[in-house]
Amino acid sequence: MEFLNPDDVTKQKLIAQGYRGFQDSPLKLQRTLFFEAANFVWEQLSTAIAKNEGVGVETVLSTDKYLSLVEEVRARGGYFMLIFIVVNTPELACERVVIRTAQKGHSVPPDKIHDRWYKSIRNLPKFAQLAKAFWVFDNSDSQPENPPVLVARGVDGVLVGPPIPSFALLDHQLALLPVWPSSEA
């Protein structure tokens, strides 16, 4: 299965233009190439779906732009699976971006990180309800030897058992999903 990451595609494009990656390339060029990469990834996803091929994509999930592709996969009888990894505050997300940037990854302005953090978590139920299977991990622990904590999992858009309490916004969004077995049964 092919795995697509717009950030990786952008970095490859920068290297092809003679840069070492994000650390020595102009921000304006990075933005231009990121939009090209995002369009390329969209085309690759669309092509894979049209051919009924398995494909994965990395996304912040801060918009619902992939909903139409997910719906197309389902309409074709395919499976959409979601692995959602989150940290417990937008401030921690900002700290992680600073670390990524120091390790030659790309930077993101703090205001965009804050905005995307909230939008991403709010989009979770919408995508989870369409998933054949989904897993939600809290990656807030900063100790590298500690893996992310699985706080929720589901099948066919339904939580399998109650989620492990994490942080308020995530707990609230997960509460929007049905839980199996239902206490109403």
Where are these regions (language model features)?
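Glycine-rich phosphate-binding loop used to anchor ATP phosphates in small-molecule kinases
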Residues: 32-84, 120, 135
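Short glycine-enriched loops at secondary-structure junctions
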Residues: 9-10, 62, 86-88
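A glycine- and Lys/Arg-enriched "phosphate-lid" helix/loop adjacent to the NTP-binding pocket
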Residues: 78-124
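NTP-dependent small-molecule kinase module
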Residues: 128-185
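Conserved substrate/cofactor phosphate-moiety recognition/catalytic segment
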Residues: 1-53
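Short, hinge-like loop/turn segments at secondary-structure boundaries
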Residues: 20-23, 74-75, 98-102
